[in-house]
Amino acid sequence: MEPPKRISFFDGRLLTAEDLTAEQDYFLGRLRRHNRLLHGYGVVQGLHVSVTGNTTAPSVTVVPGYAVDPLGHEICVCSAIVLPVPQKGTSLHVVICYRECPTDLVPVPSDPAEPDSEMKPSRIADTFELLLSATWPQRRADPCGEVTGGASGVPLARLLFSRRRWQVDRRFRVPRAH
């Protein structure tokens, strides 16, 4: 593993998009290592799951909250989310995963005589995806802080189908960041 490198600035240096991206990558990597190695992964606050709806249209509701995924990404949920669930099954995990979403398209400078300039995103939004998974892999970290095995996400609950309806499994231990 190579030690992290940050940009060295000096007067007269020409900065490129690659340099600015490297600067962002350095600080994001540092923040994510900090989150992963000092706090672990899991729910920090909120993100409680409840089963709502009836037997013909069941759904789960996740309340606002904050989590850190196994890679150190911060996941912020600002408003309640409702996700439909199948009418029957055996068990499901409710999992939240970090996602980056390119946004705010702007034209790319090109030939002024060219009427249709290419558009590229000027921002990247830190968002998330809420998933239902029949199986959820266990995660483990090696001594160097690398995460191995399975998809990156935070399981918020396990749902069990019992007596013709979904219920939150109270025995399931939600991982907690500290």
Predicted region positions:
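N-terminal "first-domain core" detector
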Residues: E2-T61
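Beta-strand-rich solenoidal segments
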Residues: M1-F9, S59-H178
